[in-house]
């Protein structure tokens, strides 16, 4: 991580600590700070920021209540990791790297990678596509690690696990999340 990214991380960590003290009062102030920080360029997510701002400012909005409940009821460390990984890594740091690599390689770089660690499942849901492929298809820990490492080099920090039932591989997934905590 370069100096600029380290400074962004420190700023976001401070901002998160600030909002956590009183989410209802501090969320609009934080959003104003994010607007200044993001700027007005094409990669500044203006549509997404407007949607977040609308939810934060409209106290009668159901999403506002949901967000505030999540902020108040979720373990602070879990909330901080989610905030840092989603907003900072996957968007503020990741998006410019993705844009750079799109131009460099002349192809799309996804914002998120959908990863199926296993086709195994213990749920037997009606109509599930995974059942059609059997339950013996598995990515190794090293293969999952390689996919995530390569993705991060391209600016991808968001991974969505599907399957099968991903938690059949619970130990591996926890280990991979610990290894790639960003």
Task: Describe the residue ranges of each PLM region.
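Auxiliary Fe-S-binding modules of radical SAM enzymes
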Residues: 1-66
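Conserved alpha-helical substructure of the radical SAM core
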Residues: 38-179
